[in-house]
């Protein structure tokens, strides 16, 4: 029986554990939280930080694992790469993970290899940043060099706004490095995102998605994804060529990746991020519905050095989307009101909060209340409803006044 170690047992990581169990693999889970959901699906659980690579290596060697995976987790990627290298397992190299996981190193990589990139600079103190940003054009994006889930990311329009934004970003960085870069004005309505699968050094699967943003509240943080891509064929081809170029330079053979790309005013693609793991927040579920490819299963199999020779995918005429339930105010969740014109589109739902739970203002993906998976008849319906979701869904906190009539209970959710 093959043994596979999972780094992280959060709710969004459970599907990978479930897949491994369904295939008869022995599953070992490591997580620093004792009350994680994943331990109920694992054969063996160790309460240990996934950032403690020596402790993880010791356990991995004792158990004699055949593979290790940090499914949809940035924080444990470097540990997985370290253990894999020490035990000659199938994974990305530590060098590749370091470049892709640290935004300052990735910007240098892009610059040194002829890619498009925004003007940027890294700092360890706000004092140095104020001095070092002369010549930069506003607006600027300020973000931790090594955080995940869009934590600590914000835009500023004037240097006077830098102080608190910089300190917030610094607090979210494990390495205490903040990167500041010029905002890329885009020619498209959406970012380009999605997951890819690499086999024998080539992209064999490209699940390209539209990345939705709430530009009125925080243009830096995603609020959902949709399929199919709104890009034309030429722009889609450009994105794939740019990502393949990164794969070639880094000599990547096999693996799953999550990407973010923007087209600038010059109509050229700018790679914002490439993450050396699957996308979180129901990306794999969305793409499985849309393309009939099990990205979760593929990632587990590749961690065990069982990469397939080819991937068979279908092209769906149906439109799918995810949407992140959130509140921009702090409070206690009372209920969520849904208009009947949107409930007809919901095909799956993952809730992370319940009525009575404390809710923090949405400033990163760790503050998501829940995620909805939608099915739409066509792109027109998808675009309209995703752009006007506040007309269909309302997160109501205790003490807030209702603004819609005609509700019927779905407790703790409620239909308008």
For every predicted segment, state its role.
Residues 116-119, 139-142, 155-191, 219-225, ...:
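Conserved ATP-binding module of the ATP-grasp superfamily
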Residues 154, 164-168, 181, 190-212, ...:
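Beta-strand scaffold of nucleotide-dependent catalytic cores
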Residues 181-182, 253-265, 404-413:
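A short glycine-rich, hydrophobically flanked beta-strand micro-motif that places a catalytic Asp/Glu
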Residues 237-259, 265, 275-331:
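Active-site "cap" helix and flanking loop/linker of ATP-utilizing ligase/carboxylase catalytic domains
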Residues 1-95, 127, 309, 327, ...:
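ATP-binding N-terminal substructure of ATP-dependent carboxylate-amine bond-forming enzymes
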Residues 3-5, 140, 203:
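Conserved hydrophobic helix-helix packing surfaces used for dimerization/oligomerization
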């Amino acid at each position: 029986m093959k043994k596979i170690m999972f780094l992280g047992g959060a709710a969004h990581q459970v599907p990978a554990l479930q897949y491994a169990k369904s295939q008869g693999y022995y599953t070992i889970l490591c997580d620093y939280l004792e009350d994680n959901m994943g331990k109920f699906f694992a054969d063996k659980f160790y309460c240990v930080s996934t950032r403690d690579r020596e402790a993880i290596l010791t356990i991995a060697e004792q158990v004699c694992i055949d593979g290790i995976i940090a499914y949809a987790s940035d924080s444990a990627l470097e540990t997985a790469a370290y253990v894999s290298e020490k035990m000659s397992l199938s994974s990305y190299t530590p060098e590749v993970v370091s470049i892709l996981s640290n935004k300052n190193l990735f910007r240098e990589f892009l610059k040194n290899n002829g890619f498009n990139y925004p003007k940027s600079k890294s700092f360890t103190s706000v004092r140095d940043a104020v001095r070092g940003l002369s010549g930069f054009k506003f607006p600027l994006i300020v973000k931790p060099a090594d955080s995940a889930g869009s934590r600590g990311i914000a835009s500023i329009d004037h240097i006077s706004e830098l102080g608190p934004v910089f300190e917030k970003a610094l607090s979210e960085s494990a390495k205490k490095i903040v990167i500041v870069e010029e905002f890329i004005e885009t020619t498209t309505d959406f970012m380009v995102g999605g997951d890819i699968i690499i086999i024998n050094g080539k992209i064999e699967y490209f699940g390209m998605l539209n990345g939705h943003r709430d530009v009125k509240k925080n243009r830096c943080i995603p609020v959902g994804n949709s399929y199919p891509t709104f890009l034309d064929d030429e722009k889609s081809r450009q994105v794939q060529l740019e990502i393949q170029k990164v794969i070639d330079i880094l000599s990547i053979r096999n693996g799953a990746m999550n990407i973010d790309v923007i087209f600038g005013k010059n109509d050229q693609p700018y790679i914002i991020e490439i993450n050396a793991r699957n996308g979180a927040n129901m990306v794999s579920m969305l793409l499985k519905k849309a393309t009939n490819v099990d990205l979760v299963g593929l990632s587990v199999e590749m961690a065990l050095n069982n990469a397939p020779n080819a991937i068979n995918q279908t092209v769906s005429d149906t439109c799918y989307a995810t949407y992140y339930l959130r509140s921009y105010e702090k409070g206690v969740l009372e209920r969520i009101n849904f208009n009947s014109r949107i409930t007809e589109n919901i095909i799956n739902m993952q809730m992370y909060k319940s009525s009575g739970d404390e809710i923090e203002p949405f400033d990163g993906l760790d503050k998501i209340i829940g995620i909805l998976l939608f099915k739409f008849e066509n792109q027109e319906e998808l675009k309209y409803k995703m752009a006007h979701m506040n007309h269909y869904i309302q997160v109501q906190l205790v003490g807030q006044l209702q603004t819609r009539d005609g509700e019927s209970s779905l407790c703790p959710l409620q239909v308008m």
